[in-house]
Amino acid sequence: MTSEADDTIAAIASPMTPAPRGIVRLSGHDCIDVLCRMKVLDTDEASGRRPFRSSKTLSLGEPLGAIEVDVMVWPTQRSYTGQPSAELHLIGSAPLLQSSLDAAIRAGARAARPGEFTMRSFLAGRLDLTQAEAVLGVIEAEDRGTLDQALSQLAGNLSRPLQAARSTLLDLLADVEAGLDFVDEDIEFISDEALIQRLDELRSLLLQTRSQLSDRGGASSTIRVVLRGLPNAGKSRLLNVLSRTESAIVTDQAGTTRDLVTVESSWGGHSFQLIDTAGSESREESDPEAPISQEAQLQAAEAARGADVHVWCIDATGGDGFESLKSPNAVLAEAKRSAQLICVATKRDLMPTDWNGESMRADLAVSSESGTGVDSLIERLVQFAEQRDAGETGSVIGTAARCQDSLAAAIEHLAQAIQWTEQAAGHELVAAEMRLAVEAIGEVTGQVYTDDILDRVFGRFCIGK
């Protein structure tokens, strides 16, 4: 994304929907002059060096007339973008916001491109590239887990270790190159043994970082919950109660559900995808329903393999729903490693008052009819979500996708540098690999970048950010 970095840019920075407050944002070296030409800044105010706020009247011409605006001004480079910046706060009406933006453009600003404010912050050194991507992660976060990850990345928890690793690698490279400069002198700036150890430590750090990025990049913030069990175990009714919908067909006839039924829900700030599956059963080949049942079982098995939580439903009035599984491990045999199993005894309302499901080895007893135990099941699901979020140390998905190749290259160059050192192939080759590793790490944090990289990162932003 090539940009005239000295231009004063302007954009609407709030949603174009009715709201008590809307924002028009400006940034650029002529920002103060633009505000003066808009007549929302006095000459005396324009000469100040400290950030300030002032209530003004902005004339928008006929038929809109004049409106009251609050003007927030950062008159020096000590702003988000590293340039003089300002915001006009006014009533969040789309026509008023657009007319205010038009007034700024008539006064000498130009319309900002997507992500241009954050790109200027990056170019000014206020943010590195991973932090800039985290801004978009905060904007796009759909639940608390992804928001926490984006905020962590914005705080520098991803870039700081990488910048430290790059700095350490530069120091090591300086020692190696100093040794080359004084090759005829009896001076050892760093021994091969120490160099190998330090390079291997850096390689391990990058491997760990790449693994975290891989985990986050391939994972969805939405937790997949699959409802399983024998036919007529109450799965569909439980799905409807949990989602407060009538998405699944409920009848007393076993085997009603054949296709997967998927519903989105949210509890405790976390997003969940609930999946109702066909009951686990086997049919004789002579049974005309066998092909349909087999296909339904394949769909259920596929859903189970990708699920984070398996809710195994046992009909409390039947009693053998869990025994038929032989052991809890059988349920998770083909599930992903981090999956959790919750055994739920359904139809609690049809059992005696003092019955709690322990005889069936159930974790919970619920009644979709009365709602008993449903809140406890939701609490278990939210608890799982919080534990998963606490254990994640990854990045926003955009960063994970962008950085994989660069980190892989850095790891490969460090491995090659270690190999050249072990084989005494010459410090010229070692230094060359180390320089390539430094460059690859710089591509992650943005110390090394091209216009194509900036296009890819900031082109995903909306205008005004």
UniProtKB/Swiss-Prot annotation:
<keyword id="KW-0342">GTP-binding</keyword>
<dbReference type="Pfam" id="PF01926">
    <property type="entry name" value="MMR_HSR1"/>
</dbReference>
<feature type="binding site">
    <location>
        <position position="257"/>
    </location>
    <ligand>
        <name>Mg(2+)</name>
    </ligand>
</feature>
<dbReference type="GO" id="GO:0046872">
    <property type="term" value="F:metal ion binding"/>
</dbReference>
<feature type="binding site">
    <location>
        <position position="236"/>
    </location>
    <ligand>
        <name>Mg(2+)</name>
    </ligand>
</feature>
<feature type="domain" description="TrmE-type G">
    <location>
        <begin position="222"/>
        <end position="386"/>
    </location>
</feature>
<comment type="subunit">
    <text>Homodimer. Heterotetramer of two MnmE and two MnmG subunits.</text>
</comment>
<keyword id="KW-0630">Potassium</keyword>
<dbReference type="Pfam" id="PF12631">
    <property type="entry name" value="MnmE_helical"/>
</dbReference>
<feature type="binding site">
    <location>
        <begin position="232"/>
        <end position="237"/>
    </location>
    <ligand>
        <name>GTP</name>
    </ligand>
</feature>
<keyword id="KW-0479">Metal-binding</keyword>
<dbReference type="GO" id="GO:0005737">
    <property type="term" value="C:cytoplasm"/>
</dbReference>
<keyword id="KW-0963">Cytoplasm</keyword>
<dbReference type="GO" id="GO:0005525">
    <property type="term" value="F:GTP binding"/>
</dbReference>
<dbReference type="InterPro" id="IPR031168">
    <property type="entry name" value="G_TrmE"/>
</dbReference>
<dbReference type="GO" id="GO:0005829">
    <property type="term" value="C:cytosol"/>
</dbReference>
<dbReference type="GO" id="GO:0002098">
    <property type="term" value="P:tRNA wobble uridine modification"/>
</dbReference>
<feature type="binding site">
    <location>
        <begin position="251"/>
        <end position="257"/>
    </location>
    <ligand>
        <name>GTP</name>
    </ligand>
</feature>
<feature type="binding site">
    <location>
        <begin position="276"/>
        <end position="279"/>
    </location>
    <ligand>
        <name>GTP</name>
    </ligand>
</feature>
<keyword id="KW-0547">Nucleotide-binding</keyword>
<dbReference type="Pfam" id="PF10396">
    <property type="entry name" value="TrmE_N"/>
</dbReference>
<dbReference type="InterPro" id="IPR025867">
    <property type="entry name" value="MnmE_helical"/>
</dbReference>
<feature type="binding site">
    <location>
        <position position="87"/>
    </location>
    <ligand>
        <name>(6S)-5-formyl-5,6,7,8-tetrahydrofolate</name>
    </ligand>
</feature>
<comment type="similarity">
    <text>Belongs to the TRAFAC class TrmE-Era-EngA-EngB-Septin-like GTPase superfamily. TrmE GTPase family.</text>
</comment>
<dbReference type="InterPro" id="IPR006073">
    <property type="entry name" value="GTP-bd"/>
</dbReference>
<dbReference type="InterPro" id="IPR005225">
    <property type="entry name" value="Small_GTP-bd"/>
</dbReference>
<dbReference type="GO" id="GO:0030488">
    <property type="term" value="P:tRNA methylation"/>
</dbReference>
<feature type="binding site">
    <location>
        <position position="25"/>
    </location>
    <ligand>
        <name>(6S)-5-formyl-5,6,7,8-tetrahydrofolate</name>
    </ligand>
</feature>
<keyword id="KW-0819">tRNA processing</keyword>
<keyword id="KW-0460">Magnesium</keyword>
<protein>
    <recommendedName>
        <fullName>tRNA modification GTPase MnmE</fullName>
        <ecNumber>3.6.-.-</ecNumber>
    </recommendedName>
</protein>
<dbReference type="InterPro" id="IPR004520">
    <property type="entry name" value="GTPase_MnmE"/>
</dbReference>
<keyword id="KW-0378">Hydrolase</keyword>
<dbReference type="GO" id="GO:0003924">
    <property type="term" value="F:GTPase activity"/>
</dbReference>
<dbReference type="InterPro" id="IPR027417">
    <property type="entry name" value="P-loop_NTPase"/>
</dbReference>
<dbReference type="InterPro" id="IPR018948">
    <property type="entry name" value="GTP-bd_TrmE_N"/>
</dbReference>
<comment type="function">
    <text>Exhibits a very high intrinsic GTPase hydrolysis rate. Involved in the addition of a carboxymethylaminomethyl (cmnm) group at the wobble position (U34) of certain tRNAs, forming tRNA-cmnm(5)s(2)U34.</text>
</comment>
<dbReference type="InterPro" id="IPR027368">
    <property type="entry name" value="MnmE_dom2"/>
</dbReference>
<feature type="binding site">
    <location>
        <position position="465"/>
    </location>
    <ligand>
        <name>(6S)-5-formyl-5,6,7,8-tetrahydrofolate</name>
    </ligand>
</feature>
<dbReference type="InterPro" id="IPR027266">
    <property type="entry name" value="TrmE/GcvT_dom1"/>
</dbReference>
<feature type="binding site">
    <location>
        <position position="126"/>
    </location>
    <ligand>
        <name>(6S)-5-formyl-5,6,7,8-tetrahydrofolate</name>
    </ligand>
</feature>
